[in-house]
């Protein structure tokens, strides 16, 4: 589209042009959304390239509120995926005009008739409305541009003169501060105007305003209906949150645009530097990343075993993986990341309710009246022949099947399951059970009171708080046995015997023993000197007993990720 409209010269074109981050290019995904303005046949088109992954669905929903139509791109080799459904529902909620496009028709593995039938089934559209393109060769892409002009309405002009602009993204520039992307819904926003963020109450100056072509192009003002950027003097994106409304200080709008909500993380993990000297560097690195990622939340955490670190909240596992990789690559940090967990609502015997984000934070069980765990609403799209194995997998995760519907040759399975059971290896097991053909999407459903316990893991009698995990009582024994076996594989043998135990309170539910190295202390003694041999063996026994009492076991970083690789 950028090439056909002349927005970017052919010599400057490259794949994933709008994906600026190195990680985006490497993984072939969009992590941050990107707006761009194009001119075509006398019309101005504002395109927003959005991430498709469930972790970033709030950003997608905000950007959908900034536009009048959406191009739904479906891979001709893959067909409709679970996240396709999620994003279609978001677009339909906003009453957007959807233009269905099948891409990659040039590939030998493409199955255009099947994917066409799936889209017709999903949207209820006519087959003639679906545009079949190859983004690689450019075939039929101009039909997509024509369809935007024909089917997507122009922004409606409002009678109000109040300045109202929706923030649909923001990022931190090292040299210029916070830059926000906005859609103007009414009024005008001139350069150097005093502006206010209505949800946070922050006041600032619009140092520069303009549009993106896709590079920044300064203008004197932004007008009703336009999509553009504002360079502010703010020092953190949390002061200009996605979904907030920008207005003028001198003539503020009477009401903010609808739909703003605080993004709440539901996956938490402890990040600890391998060297304690790097704790300050970790904190500074996260401060920098959070300037451009308002969804990132963190607080200090102190572990007796791992030392000082941070407990960080994420929107999902992909979000966590991206942040971990950026910390290691961009800031050169060597990290130990503990098992991801979710937050639990704990009702105390006094009636007080508290939230815990780590199993080690659970109060003494005598003070706990009830523990509520988050449940997810999940959706799986799969070829029909895998329905049986998927239902078995859902039941094994304490899930409940709610509904099965069909899109042409594939089934859509709706189910509820505990969020914690989807955070470990559910996705890998799903891919394995369906030979990689199923796709999976989920969202937070609510909190249910369950019979939960905390499993602690002890190494040589010492509780390793970073390994503690919440589990349903019915699953606790199996988890304890499995994890102690895994720990035996990853913790190196010592000069003394080491007990690896799983416990619920004071009750040991599983034990593995890591055998000691055997050093032959009699090797240099003459074979006939039995008394001397016996003395040396006895001395070795006493030494090992002393080491067992006072010896410290070094636990490798792999031990803290064993929960992610459960069978």
Regions found by a protein language model. Name each.
Residues 1-567:
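Structural and coupling elements of P-loop NTPases
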């Amino acid at each position: 589209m950028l090439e056909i409209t002349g927005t970017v010269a052919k010599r400057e074109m490259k794949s994933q042009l709008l994906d600026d981050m190195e990680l985006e290019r490497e993984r072939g995904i969009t992590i941050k959304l990107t707006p761009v303005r194009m001119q075509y046949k006398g019309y101005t088109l504002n395109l927003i390239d959005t991430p498709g992954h469930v972790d970033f669905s709030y950003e997608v929903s905000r950007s959908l509120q900034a536009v009048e139509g959406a191009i739904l791109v479906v891979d001709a080799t893959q067909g409709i995926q679970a996240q396709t459904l999620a994003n279609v529902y978001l677009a339909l909620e906003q009453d957007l005009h959807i233009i269905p496009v099948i891409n990659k028709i040039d590939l030998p593995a493409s199955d255009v008739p099947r994917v066409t039938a799936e889209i017709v089934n999903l949207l209820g559209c006519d087959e003639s409305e679906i545009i079949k393109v190859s983004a690689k060769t450019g075939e039929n892409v101009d039909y997509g541009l024509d369809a935007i002009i024909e089917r997507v309405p122009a922004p409606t002009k409002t009678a109000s003169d109040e300045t109202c602009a929706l923030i649909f993204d923001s990022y931190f520039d090292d040299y210029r501060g916070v830059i926000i992307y906005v859609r103007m819904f009414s009024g005008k926003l001139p350069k150097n105007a005093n502006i206010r963020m209505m949800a946070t109450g922050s006041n600032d100056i619009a140092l520069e305003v303009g549009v993106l072509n896709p590079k920044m192009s300064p203008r004197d003002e932004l007008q009703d209906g336009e999509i553009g950027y504002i360079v502010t003097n703010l020092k953190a994106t949390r002061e200009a949150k996605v979904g907030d409304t920008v207005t003028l200080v001198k003539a503020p709008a009477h009401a903010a645009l609808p739909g703003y909500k605080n993004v709440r993380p539901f996956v938490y993990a402890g990040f600890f530097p391998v060297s304690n000297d790097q704790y300050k560097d970790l904190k500074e690195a996260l401060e920098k990343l959070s300037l451009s990622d308002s969804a990132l939340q963190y607080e200090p955490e102190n572990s007796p075993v791992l030392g000082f670190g941070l407990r960080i909240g994420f929107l999902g596992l992909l979000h966590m993986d991206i942040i971990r990789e950026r910390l290691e690559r961009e800031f050169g940090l060597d990290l130990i990341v503990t098992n991801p967990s979710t937050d639990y609502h704990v009702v105390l015997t006094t009636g007080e309710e508290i939230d815990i984000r780590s199993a080690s934070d659970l109060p003494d069980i005598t003070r706990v009246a009830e523990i509520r765990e988050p449940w997810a609403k999940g959706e799986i799209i799969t070829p029909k022949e895998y329905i049986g194995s998927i239902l078995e997998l859902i039941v094994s995760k304490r899930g409940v099947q709610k509904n099965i519907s069909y899109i042409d040759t594939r089934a859509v399975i709706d189910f509820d399951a505990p969020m914690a059971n989807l955070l470990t290896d559910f996705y890998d097991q799903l891919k394995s059970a369906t030979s990689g053909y199923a796709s999976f999407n989920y969202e937070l459903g609510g909190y249910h009171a369950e019979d939960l316990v905390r499993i602690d893991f002890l190494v040589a009698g010492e509780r390793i708080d970073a390994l503690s995990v919440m589990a349903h009582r019915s699953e606790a024994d199996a988890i304890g046995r499995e994890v102690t076996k895994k720990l035996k594989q990853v913790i190196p043998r010592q000069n003394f015997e080491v007990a690896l135990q799983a416990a619920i309170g004071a009750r040991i539910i599983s034990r593995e023993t890591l055998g000691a190295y055997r050093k032959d202390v009699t090797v240099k003694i003459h074979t006939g000197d039995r008394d001397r041999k016996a003395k040396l063996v006895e001395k070795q026994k006493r030494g090992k007993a002393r080491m067992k009492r006072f010896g410290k076991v070094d636990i490798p970083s792999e031990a803290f990720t064993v929960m992610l690789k459960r069978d």
